[in-house]
Amino acid sequence: MSKRINKWEKPFHIERGDVYMGPFNLDSNLQKGIQRGYRPILVTQSDWQNRRSESVIVVPGTSELKKTGMSTHIVLPMIKGLPKQTMFCCEQRGVVNVNQLDKYCCTLPPDIMKKITRACRLAERGAKIKCRKTGK
């Protein structure tokens, strides 16, 4: 008896905290300051949703370390698997198709994911976001 193939199964298992290289916002004509292009993208969607969904919620990363003091910008230390020091811009979350996730880079440790979760919640609340360095 042959094994039935579940149409929802993916060829690889995507987990919350995984960082992949892939395209982000390629189809849109975006303004300055909005992340787009081929870059590190961090999966922030829950593992339960990742098992069945054909798309995932992600946070774009950048190697341009500008506005590092913002509460929604999380700068990572040098992590094996990422080519450069990376900052994730949690206020710019988006959705990508799992087929667009190209190269697996690494999985972030729980302490960094707590910071990412907090920054995403700050961005979602729409509260006035202050700079950690200047307080403005």
Where are these regions (language model features)?
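Compact nucleic-acid interaction/catalytic patches
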Residues: L30-M78
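C-terminal terminal-subdomain/extension
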Residues: S2-N6, F12, P77-K136
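Short acidic/polar alpha-helix capping motifs at helix-coil junctions
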Residues: I5-E9, Y38-I41
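Short, charged beta-turn/beta-strand-edge "cap" motif at the junction between a beta-strand
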Residues: N25-N29
